């Protein structure tokens, strides 16, 4: 693993944590209980009102729940470092750590977990790849693949699992074409990105950790091989744009940084958007009048999707670490404190959103959510995620307006601290 000044992409050693003096302690709060996984929002509402900032003994994190405080943490990037956002939540076993300590596994921190001033330098070049021109180039592909996946569902006949038939493959295919990956590798790439979710944000057992570590190594080697091939043969894709920037000025963007950006983007652009699509369909179909409304008037879709991001965000938390001693909302916080930012709690804050537990596709301030972050680390792919979801939901509403949820299904959610979306979502329609 990299030991360069750039910093490793994943840091595997987790320093021991103690609760800040004078801060309330919750000995039971964790994101891994069945009740939290089924529906975290009642619990988040309770703790936000009783102790908006508290220390979770089980997670080893200071938990922040109010929108005002979250925005302050995101804004003050000199005090609150993002260096820990790609690190495993819990310690990993020695055998898994040894696999990732190999000199061949050396991605460096680049976007979500890189400190200033390097973050802005790297983001500037990566942002060029998310231009309006590239969105226009990609949109016809999104439309075509949406229609093809709908065709496949109709041909197969319902009921079908929306996640495996549409919600999971479509975002993967889009981000992989955006990066430039070979379509023949899609299935393997999708498997690798799911493994990274469990490793970094979940709590896998030792055997799972070892298996995931081996696959992460293969995934990193794949990314490096792919970038090397693009270096020799440029195309009209994100990787080629990054390599062009590197060649123009290697001090502005290093070759290893290009490799590491590709390693990170193929996960971020897949899992988060997959959850976004599945959560969107779930929320819209749970109340039939909402689905009927967007079928009748597709102009409602963009705001409805913002309400999904507020009400059932695909990313319910993020992390930070204090660089220096600081304080927030009257709580003194020592340097080195791990901070858990509860986006889900803030997005349901009643002082900001009327009747926050209600899903309202016409909510006027739905876009005030914080699901894409805030400040210099605001999600670079937000525009693409919104485009994908808008095209997909519009296509589904036009092609299959009789869509409905299969009655009696119990939704199962992946046990992790950050990402939220059903593992399966069964739907049916009139034949």
Predicted segments with their positions:
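Cytochrome P450
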Residues: 2-431
